[in-house]
């Protein structure tokens, strides 16, 4: 399987240098990451919003090693929120944040990440939107869920992400499927050991459906993070069986993947949110997109050969 190999490469400094230096790489990356600055991303926000789509914005970046970098990540999100306020687009775009960017892995990282993310959550609430805490590898999740619980005391609309491939996630879903919660379900995009995670696609797909049923039958707000046509159809059927209205759940897909499906679901009246990343530190994000789906890797390889 290529997925684990690609995920290993996402942590390789040598591979980072090789791919980042290739002239064609940036052209291909633009499919998934349409800009590096707030100014470059504003036309994308306007265009998607005009098409009836909502967004979740991710300022890409990982491997924070100093508190100053964590503070810079916080400030980047605050600048984005200020711009959304100016554009009066706060109700169309939420934020997705990785707590690793806010210093979670540093000494005293739990408290540091909470201190850095809280101003972002406060600023988002002030313009009528919210923040979702992304899930990262399994060793970070207890801290993420604790921060999520703490933030929800003052900002109950704060969301979180759960990953279907982890054995623990069904229990997490039961705990989170409560009134007022916002939970995004994804398959998972980190290399996890067999002791904690399913390793085969058919196992992950079955777990995804089991967990999605828990969320749909609960009283929270499920967010379906998938491009899989079969899982999308199953989600619609589970929502129907649970008696959910179209505004009581939403679909989320990545920018640059199945864009026609984004528009189709929105045209049918579904809430459709496009996960849109931007920034200069794109390597780790990009490599996980390749690992998630063989078609992404084929696209990248074909583009490298054609444009190189």
Task: Name each region found by the language model.
Residues 1-308:
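Positively charged, amphipathic and often flexible ligand-engagement surfaces
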């Amino acid at each position: 399987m290529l997925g684990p190999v690609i995920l290993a490469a996402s942590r390789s400094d040598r591979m980072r240098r090789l791919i980042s230096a290739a002239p064609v790489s940036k052209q291909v990356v633009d499919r998934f990451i349409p800009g590096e600055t707030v100014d470059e991303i504003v036309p994308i926000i306007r265009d998607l919003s005009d098409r009836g789509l909502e967004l979740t914005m991710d300022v890409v970046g990982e491997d924070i090693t100093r508190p100053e970098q964590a503070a810079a990540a916080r400030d980047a999100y605050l600048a984005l929120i200020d711009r959304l306020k100016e554009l009066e687009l706060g109700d169309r775009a939420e934020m997705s944040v990785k707590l690793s960017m806010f210093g979670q892995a540093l000494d005293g990282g739990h408290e540091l990440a909470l201190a850095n993310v809280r101003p972002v959550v406060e600023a988002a609430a002030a313009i009528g939107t919210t923040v979702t805490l992304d899930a990262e590898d399994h060793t970070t999740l207890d801290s993420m869920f604790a921060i999520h619980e703490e933030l929800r005391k003052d900002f109950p609309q704060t969301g979180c992400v759960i990953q279907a491939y982890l054995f623990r996630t069904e229990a997490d879903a039961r705990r989170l499927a409560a009134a007022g919660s916002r939970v995004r379900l994804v398959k998972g995009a980190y290399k996890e050991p067999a002791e904690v995670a399913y390793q085969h696609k058919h196992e992950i797909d079955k777990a995804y459906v089991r967990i999605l049923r828990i969320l749909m039958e609960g009283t929270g707000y499920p967010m379906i993070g998938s491009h899989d046509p079969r899982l999308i159809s199953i989600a619609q059927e589970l929502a129907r069986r649970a008696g959910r209205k179209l505004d009581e759940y939403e679909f989320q897909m990545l920018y640059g993947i199945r864009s026609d499906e984004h528009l189709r679901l929105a045209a049918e009246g579904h809430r459709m949110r496009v996960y849109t990343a931007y920034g200069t530190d794109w390597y780790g994000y990009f490599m996980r997109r390749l690992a998630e789906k063989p078609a992404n890797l084929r696209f990248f390889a074909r583009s490298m050969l054609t444009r190189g």
